[in-house]
Amino acid sequence: IFIDKVLNNEISLFENKEEILIGHEVMYGVQKLFADLVLVTPQKMIAIEIKAYHDNFKRLDNQLQGYRKLFDSVYVLITENHVEKIKSLPYKWFGILEITNDRNITLRRKAKIIQKFSKEDILETMPIRYLCEYFNIKHNKLAEDIRLDLRKKTIKDLKKALNIYMERKMGYKFQNFEHERGNVSHYEDISILSMNQLSVLRQ
C-alpha cells in the first residue's frame, strides 16, 4: 500500500514530482546491509526502513547510521504500536511514516536532508566493473586500490555515479513490477522489486 501511494503521488517525499524508481532489499555500503525500500529519482535517493507490528528496534540504530552514509534522506515506516517509541529516540534527523490499522499512511515527521556522506560506503555500493566504466579507468589494479584512488573524487561526482548506478540496476526490475502489479500492489508483486541477489548488485 505504501508503494501504491507513493506512485500515485498520495505521499510526497520529494520536493518535485519526478519519475520514481523503487527497489526492495537493496544492498549498500561497507557492511553490505540491505535497505527495505529505496526510492530513486535522477536527483535524489531515499531509504525506507520498515518496522512492522512485531518488529523490534534492536538493529535500528545501526541501520539508520548505515543509511545516512549515502542516502539523501531516510524514513522509518512504522505501525501504530511503534509511534511513541520511535518519537522518543534522541536523534530527529530521519523522517517517520505511520501506517494505521485502516491502511492509511501518515507523514509523522519530514526527514532532514543529509549533507555529509561516506565516500567509502558510496564506492563499496558500486561494483568495480561499473566504476571503471563510469570513470573511464583501466581495470588493471586490485579493486581496493581502484576504490582508494576514487576517494580523491568529490562527493558530488561519486553521488552522481551512485544515482546512475541505482537507476540502471533498479530500472528493469521496476518496469517488470509496473507491468505485473495492476492497479493495486500485492505481496507477490513486491518480490519482483527485490535486489537481494549478489549477482545483480555486484556484477
Go through each PLM region and give its residues.
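Active-site metal-binding core of divalent-cation-utilizing nuclease and nuclease-like domains
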Residues: 3-42
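Short, flexible loop segments at the rims of nucleotide/cofactor-binding pockets, characterized by
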Residues: 24-27, 50-56
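Short connector loops at helix/strand junctions that flank enzyme active sites
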Residues: 32-34, 43-45, 69-71, 91
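Conserved catalytic cores of phosphodiester-cleaving nucleases, focusing on short active-site segments
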Residues: 37-39, 44-53
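Short acidic-glycine loop/turn motifs at beta-strand connectors
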Residues: 41-43, 100-103
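Catalytic cores of nucleic-acid endonucleases
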Residues: 55-98
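A conserved mid-domain beta-alpha-beta active-site/ligand-binding segment of alpha/beta enzyme cores
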Residues: 104-178
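C-terminal non-catalytic accessory extensions
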Residues: 168-203
